[in-house]
Design a protein with these regions (language model features):
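PLP-dependent class I/II
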Residues: 1-204
Length: 204
């Protein structure tokens, strides 16, 4: 048989509507479910977790021990104490309220400051917006100019094994305040427009 890996570190961070049921809820014998406390509690707690079919449990333990030896005991105990003694569901709900405000700030700023040729996702949760620019724009090559403008992003090619996504970028709204998001998107929009103008001049 074939096992399905359900990598869902942002599954609890939905804010427009309830998150869909996990695939593992429908098939616990064929789905491996992965999560991470670094997304839901604190970014410095670099501990992941997995729900696996019973038939794979021993193999996964061996694979984990051979690859990472042992995660930090201190971090594991910190997480265990937090989950036992703190209202973590309420904490996640408050995080989602903050992220929704920041998501909205980014979407509004993209509409105001990015060229009409650009398109982007409207995420219902998580940390990121995916932006597509015209195909002639290479976001990896454009990165140094963005950094000069004091903004950064992840080029789309980082998410593909074949070089695809060169005209795409991933923007994060997780950490900055709405005001900083607006400033950053405005600056990045100027960089994108200048790059489009330069590319257009080169083609003419």
């Amino acid at each position: 048989g074939i096992f399905v890996v359900e990598d869902n570190p942002y599954g609890l961070l939905g804010f427009d509507k309830p998150s869909p049921n996990a695939m593992r809820a429908e098939d616990s014998e064929n789905v491996i479910y992965l999560g991470s406390f670094s997304k839901t509690i604190a970014s410095g707690l670099r501990i992941g977790w997995a729900l696996v079919p019973q038939s794979l449990k021993d193999k996964l333990v061996i694979a984990s021990e051979s690859s990472i030896l042992c995660p930090s005991n201190f971090t594991q105990l910190t997480i265990a104490n937090y989950l036992t003694n703190q209202p973590w569901r309420d904490q996640i709900a408050s995080f989602c309220e903050v992220y929704k405000v920041r998501r909205d700030a980014m979407l509004e700023s993209l509409t105001e400051y990015f060229p009409q040729e650009a398109t982007w996702t409207k995420p219902g949760g998580g940390f990121y917006v995916w932006v597509n620019l015209p195909p002639e724009i290479d976001t990896k090559a454009m990165m140094p100019k963005a950094i000069v403008a004091k903004v950064a992003y992840v080029p789309g090619t980082a998410f593909y094994a074949d070089g695809f996504g060169s005209w795409s970028m991933r923007l994060s709204y997780c950490h900055p305040t709405p005001e900083r998001i607006r400033e950053g998107v405005k600056a990045l929009g100027q960089v994108v427009k200048q790059e489009m103008s330069r590319r257009g001049s080169a083609l003419n």
